[in-house]
């Protein structure tokens, strides 16, 4: 439920509320003689105020209150988060901005209670909270849209899966996470049906768990992305790729070590014969590469080239 108001020609307000009921049932199986039923009600109220001070300066402030009720064992959460952004227009083509925002993510029931031959439940999993900072520049000139940004992220109790290679099992746990980096991207439109995009990010993601007690490298430092899209009449097709280099594998109880880059590619095409129908073909791993996409001490290789053909009808 959401309501938008145009207060005047310089101010806009958004107010909204959200509700969702979650339920998780662990049914009887050969490995378990009991059944379990978990549920909780998720509530949220939020607001946003956008204020244009003049032709060059605009500020946006948003707030959200999130809470749960009726959780098992009274394991309820309550969080207030806020965000703000200031945009300054340099000229008709250039803007600079600065933003800061808090984040809040609750653990899912699957992460807390999910159990299988390889998954270990963690009912004590805590929600993750964080704060994100970003300053940047945007430029729209002709058919090009440029963006450059410097960012920093701090997350407390980041929810992450940890793999135990000895027992061949994994469990979701909390660890602290931080990342600082710079990114540059460009979107290119043309007079014809083609459009293009590319981007590069240099970053330094790190994590600290109770097991290690020190900041250790994670994921990869260099990411290159790119894509091309063809759109004409009822057909839209796109080819995209993501290359992650300067990667590390990060074991749960040992120091990270270097691992090879990976290159992921996807082709997607949608044909819409009418307003209610879509025929979609998605092909993953177009180059049929065998890349280890895991960032833990175990190896998990990308699925060979595969496709999904689907039909969607909107009522």
Predicted regions and their residues:
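Outer-membrane beta-barrel signature, preferentially recognizing the C-terminal barrel domain
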Residues: 75, 88-89, 94-95, 99-156, ...
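Membrane-embedded beta-strand positions of outer-membrane beta-barrel proteins
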Residues: 15-17, 61-63, 84, 98-100, ...
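Outer-membrane beta-barrel translocator domains and adjoining extracellular loop/strand segments
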Residues: 25-34, 71-78, 109-116, 158-167, ...
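Face-selective signature of the C-terminal outer-membrane beta-barrel domain
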Residues: 1-79, 83, 87-89, 139, ...
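Gram-negative outer-membrane beta-barrel transporters
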Residues: 53-56, 151-154, 173-252, 272-278, ...
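Residues on the lipid-exposed face of transmembrane beta-strands in outer-membrane beta-barrel proteins
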Residues: 1-5, 45-51, 84-88, 135-139, ...
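Transmembrane beta-strands of outer-membrane beta-barrel pores
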Residues: 19-25, 65-69, 88, 100-106, ...
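Outer-envelope beta-barrel architecture signal
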Residues: 9-13, 55-59, 80, 92-96, ...
């Amino acid at each position: 439920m959401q309501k938008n108001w145009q207060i005047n020609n310089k101010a806009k307000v958004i107010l909204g509320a959200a509700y969702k009921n979650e339920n998780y049932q662990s049914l009887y199986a050969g490995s378990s003689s009991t059944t379990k039923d978990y549920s909780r009600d998720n509530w949220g109220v939020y607001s946003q105020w956008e204020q244009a001070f003049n032709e060059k300066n605009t500020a946006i402030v948003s707030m959200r209150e999130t809470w749960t009720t009726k959780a098992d064992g009274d394991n309820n959460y309550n969080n207030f988060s806020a965000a703000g952004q200031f945009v300054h227009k340099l000229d008709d083509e250039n803007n600079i901005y600065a933003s800061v925002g808090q984040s809040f993510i609750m653990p899912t029931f699957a992460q807390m209670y999910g159990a299988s031959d390889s998954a270990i439940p963690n009912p004590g999993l805590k929600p993750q909270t964080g704060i994100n900072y970003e300053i940047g520049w945007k430029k729209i000139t002709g058919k090009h849209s440029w963006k450059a940004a410097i960012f920093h992220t701090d997350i407390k109790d980041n929810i992450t899966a940890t793999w135990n290679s000895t027992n061949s099992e994994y469990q979701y746990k909390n660890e602290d996470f931080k990342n600082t980096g710079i990114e540059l991207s460009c979107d290119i439109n043309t007079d014809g049906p083609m459009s293009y995009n590319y981007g590069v990010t240099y970053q330094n993601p790190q994590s600290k768990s109770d097991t290690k007690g020190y900041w250790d490298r994670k994921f990869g430092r260099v990411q290159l992305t790119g894509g091309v899209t063809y759109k004409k009449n009822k057909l839209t097709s796109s080819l995209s790729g993501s290359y992650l280099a300067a990667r590390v594998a990060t074991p749960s109880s040992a120091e990270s070590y270097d691992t090879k880059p990976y290159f992921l590619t996807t082709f997607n095409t949608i044909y819409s014969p009418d307003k209610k129908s879509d025929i979609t073909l998605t092909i993953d791993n177009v180059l049929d590469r065998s890349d280890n996409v895991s960032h833990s001490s175990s190896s998990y290789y990308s699925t060979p080239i595969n496709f999904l053909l689907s039909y969607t009808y909107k009522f």
